[in-house]
């Protein structure tokens, strides 16, 4: 065809490597709690306490913590299930529930960072390279240069990094 450019060489050869989006198009009324919830058993909760204890006795900067540094078989199972829901299910998962009230915020940030690596590599949350972002109402007014997560504005239901499969 005259006047056209052949880009067929850029096509993906193996269709099996293209992630499916089946099930990821939904409205809230179609979802059931079991479609997106992963419950933690008692052993998994104990593993969280073990992570907290170990990081207190051998402190490392949060960004250096990796799941391989801990014996967490039950948490690994739970997070693999959550990842499967994200990758092949409705596209998001809720872990029910991390014992936030049992530990200090800094301890749970370490746990959250460590367990997040079971889902995939942790990535920057802001353009400036911020890796861990605190969602808090700072009293600022929502507008240019002020993220909604720093205000009391109601945020539209969404998932971040929706292009993760590309």
Q: Where does each model-flagged region fall?
A:
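Fe(II)/2-oxoglutarate
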Residues: 1-81
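Generic structural signal for short, flexible, solvent-exposed coil/loop and linker residues
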Residues: 15, 59-64, 81-87, 121-124, ...
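Short capping/connector residues at structural and topological boundaries
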Residues: 70, 75-77, 137-140, 162
């Amino acid at each position: 065809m005259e006047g056209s450019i052949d880009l067929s060489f850029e096509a993906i050869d193996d269709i099996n490597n293209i992630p499916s989006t089946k099930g990821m198009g939904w409205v809230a009324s179609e979802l059931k709690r079991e479609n997106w919830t992963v419950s933690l058993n008692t052993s998994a909760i104990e593993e969280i306490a073990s992570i907290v204890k170990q990081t207190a006795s051998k402190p490392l900067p949060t960004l250096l913590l990796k799941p391989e540094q801990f014996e967490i078989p039950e948490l690994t199972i739970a997070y693999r299930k959550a990842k499967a829901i994200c990758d092949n299910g409705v596209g998001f998962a809720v872990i029910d529930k991390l014992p936030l009230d049992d530990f200090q915020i800094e301890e749970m940030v370490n746990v959250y960072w460590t367990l997040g690596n079971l889902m995939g590599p942790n990535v920057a949350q802001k353009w400036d390279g911020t890796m861990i972002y605190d969602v808090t109402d700072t009293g600022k007014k929502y507008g240019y240069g002020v993220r909604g997560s720093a205000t009391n504005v109601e945020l539209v239901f969404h998932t971040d990094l929706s292009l993760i499969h590309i």
